[in-house]
């Protein structure tokens, strides 16, 4: 009864008002699975292709009607009649149909929408929650959240160079407690910023986006907020950064406009990070070097890889082939997992498996352009990732994922596992 009988895609809007794809997969039993595809602002060069129409008369050229048509008129006829429980077979059928490395014929957004909708339909058909359908009976670990409470870079219209300043409530005993701590710190930060006369408008991912005197001032106001909320920085709450360095890199030099000395060589960037790590309880730095600066990545990993989590996002783009090269060269010790960077559930699971076998941590991540779809939350529990990055404590597109994790924790009840600081198993704490 899990035979696919119909596949239908439509154009919807994401959290930034840009079009994206929503796909519905119908089964013989009458069951339906629905999935929406996210979209990024700062993207890696080697990401799978997000197919846009380019017609400037519609949505400023960002329409996705070509991708919709590819689902409804090309992919659908190839997978109708297949069993929804054959996830690997269906994903492979779509990859073969596309025939390109970066999914540039059908579009990664078209393929991913179908891939996720198939998984959701299959889970519904067999009567399992999505996290358990994907991960099996051992899927029970709730992730420690990386909460992006202050935005800069491509995620905000301000003068802050670093894209994301995040808190990780690692001292919590449960996901629900971690969420509460994060919310309290978020509200405390609003008070701190107001007290300094700063703007409290929010960026794409729900974090505050004020103009500040320096990147370091962002860390100072967050430290103040943690303490005002009644928590101890470095013990109960840790800090994490997403620098998105590819956006700052040109001709072998990094430019941080908000620093006293804006121009930095890769070695000077490592010095800059080491100084911050020595001064603040930073446990994780994502995309500290540009995606093509592999020598810089090696410098950063060698210097700080035993002390903190070094996360590759634009570097690895959730691609097992690129990740394998990074592992062989000893670059980074963690990978950010974004479903739409690679474009299918099967390939995403392959990347996670490869990372874990190499002793790399995995951080399941949203994109800056999100929807109300909560697949991300289920995926983080399905693979026992231990960490999730899904924005601030504001905007429904972000909070939807947190609320789904609360439901999952409730459902798992006494079998739920939350490891807090222990998720950083591959660094010295």
Curated annotation (Swiss-Prot):
State the GO CC annotations. Answer: cell surface; extracellular region; phosphopyruvate hydratase complex
SUPFAM superfamilies for this protein: Enolase C-terminal domain-like, Enolase N-terminal domain-like
Output this protein's name: Enolase
GN (gene name): eno
Q: Which UniProt keywords apply?
A: Cytoplasm, Glycolysis, Lyase, Magnesium, Metal-binding, Secreted
Q: Where in the cell is it found?
A: Cytoplasm; Secreted; Cell surface
Cofactor(s) needed by this chain: Mg(2+)
**Residues engaged in binding (2R)-2-phosphoglycerate:** 163, 338, 367-368, 389
* Predominant location: cytoplasm
What GO terms describe the biological role, i.e. biological process, of this protein? glycolytic process
GO function term, MF aspect, one: phosphopyruvate hydratase activity
Active-site residue numbers? 205, 338
| Enzyme Commission number, as recorded | 4.2.1.11
Residues where Mg(2+) binds? 242, 286, 313
Q: Which residues cross the membrane?
A: none
Q: How is the cofactor bound?
A: Binds a second Mg(2+) ion via substrate during catalysis.
Q: What does this protein do?
A: Catalyzes the reversible conversion of 2-phosphoglycerate (2-PG) into phosphoenolpyruvate (PEP). It is essential for the degradation of carbohydrates via glycolysis.
Give the pathway listed in the UniProt entry for this protein. Answer: Carbohydrate degradation; glycolysis; pyruvate from D-glyceraldehyde 3-phosphate: step 4/5
Q: Which Pfam families does the record cross-reference, listed alphabetically?
A: Enolase_C, Enolase_N
The catalysed reaction is: (2R)-2-phosphoglycerate = phosphoenolpyruvate + H2O
Q: Which Gene3D superfamilies match?
A: Enolase-like C-terminal domain, Enolase-like, N-terminal domain
**Recorded family membership:** Belongs to the enolase family.
What domain of life?
Answer: Bacteria
Give the species this sequence originates from. Geobacter metallireducens (strain ATCC 53774 / DSM 7210 / GS-15)
């Amino acid at each position: 009864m899990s035979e696919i009988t119909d596949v239908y895609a439509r154009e919807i809007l994401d959290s930034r008002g840009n079009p994206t794809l929503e796909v519905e997969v119908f089964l013989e039993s009458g069951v339906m699975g629905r999935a929406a595809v996210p979209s990024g602002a700062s993207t890696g060069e080697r990401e799978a292709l997000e197919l846009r129409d380019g017609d400037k008369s519609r949505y400023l050229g960002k329409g996705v009607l070509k991708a919709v048509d590819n689902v409804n008129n090309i992919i659908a006829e190839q997978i109708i009649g297949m069993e929804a429980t054959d996830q690997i077979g269906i994903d492979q059928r779509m990859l073969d149909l596309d025939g390109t490395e970066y999914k540039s014929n059908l579009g990664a957004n078209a393929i991913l929408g179908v891939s996720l909708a198939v998984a959701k339909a299959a889970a519904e058909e067999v009567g399992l929650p999505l996290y358990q359908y994907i991960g099996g009976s051992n899927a029970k670990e709730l992730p420690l959240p990386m909460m992006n409470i202050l935005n800069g870079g491509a995620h905000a219209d301000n003068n802050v160079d670093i894209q994301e300043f995040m808190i990780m409530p690692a001292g919590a005993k449960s996901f629900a407690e971690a969420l509460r701590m994060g919310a309290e710190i978020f509200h405390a930060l609003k008070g701190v910023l107001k007290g300094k006369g700063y703007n409290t408008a929010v960026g794409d991912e729900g974090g505050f986006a004020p103009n500040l005197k320096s990147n370091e001032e962002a860390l100072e106001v967050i430290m103040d907020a943690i303490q005002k909320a009644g928590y101890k920085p470095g013990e109960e709450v840790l800090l994490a950064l997403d620098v998105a360095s590819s956006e700052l890199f040109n001709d072998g030099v990094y430019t941080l406009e908000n620093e006293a000395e804006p121009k930095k060589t890769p070695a000077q960037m490592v010095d800059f990070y080491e100084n911050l790590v020595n001064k603040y309880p930073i446990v994780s730095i994502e995309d500290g070097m540009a995606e093509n600066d592999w020598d810089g990545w090696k410098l950063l990993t060698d210097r700080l890889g035993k002390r903190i989590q070094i996360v590759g996002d634009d570097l690895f783009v959730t691609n097992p082939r690129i990740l394998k090269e990074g592992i062989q060269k000893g670059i980074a010790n963690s990978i950010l997992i974004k479903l739409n960077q690679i474009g299918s559930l099967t390939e995403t699971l392959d990347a996670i498996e490869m990372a874990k076998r190499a002793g790399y941590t995995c951080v399941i991540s949203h994109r800056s352009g999100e929807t109300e779809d909560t697949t991300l939350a289920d995926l983080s529990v399905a693979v026992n990732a231990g960490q999730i990055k899904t924005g601030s404590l504001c905007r429904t597109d972000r909070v939807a994922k947190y609320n789904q994790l609360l439901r999952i924790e409730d459902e798992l009840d006494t079998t739920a596992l939350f490891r807090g600081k222990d998720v950083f198993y591959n660094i010295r704490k």
